[in-house]
């Protein structure tokens, strides 16, 4: 059949389907599911059930009121949509719960089995003159043995190593020392001492140690160095310096003259331009 019927329980409450709602995201779109509501008043029996018939090919009615243009989500904010929901997987829930519990409450269980050691008090009466109350306590403590519980927990792998790592050091091989000096001691003569004598560094400009040079040695040194004065080269140097000074002065003078000429030319062009503008303004007036 092309048409489908919808049952209305009461005349006051009517089930409404509207295209103003947004399209479902997780469902396929089928235009055959669109219905246009047709209202009908039941006058004979107000308590009887009414039927609202809709057809697939019926033309939608124009909205007669302003309320019909408002979306259902705004008109009925507490409207509950019974969309199909996937069933919950209990295995996934249990796994996630187990992981979260292990993160929030880390278990302090030992890695290996628990060991128990029985301990007895070796000194039942340590005090020589105890009180009667202390004697009773000591008797009860000595008679009752203690049991110590030993657990081995997992160590943190991020902790630094407890023991120092020794490198593979090789054994040091000590060889016999080879002496450069001759073992045969010889007596140093005066000639050898003079031959290996190194004089101190003495300068005419720098003498931090305060050494002095004898006059005889100074006079001997002056005789070997001839005193000469190169007058020709000194004359050439003085003439070259004077010529360079004159050339620099002439260059400065020429640069100043060229700069002054440029300034005068710019001033003349500026004055001519101003005069031309003034003449144009006078011509426009007359």
Curated annotation (Swiss-Prot):
Disulfide bonds: none annotated. Transmembrane segments: none annotated. Keywords: mRNA processing, mRNA splicing, Nucleus, Spliceosome. Pfam families: SKIP_SNW. It is found in: Nucleus. Residues 253-279 have a biased composition (Basic and acidic residues). Involved in pre-mRNA splicing. Associated with the spliceosome. This is Pre-mRNA-processing protein 45. It comes from Candida albicans (strain SC5314 / ATCC MYA-2876).
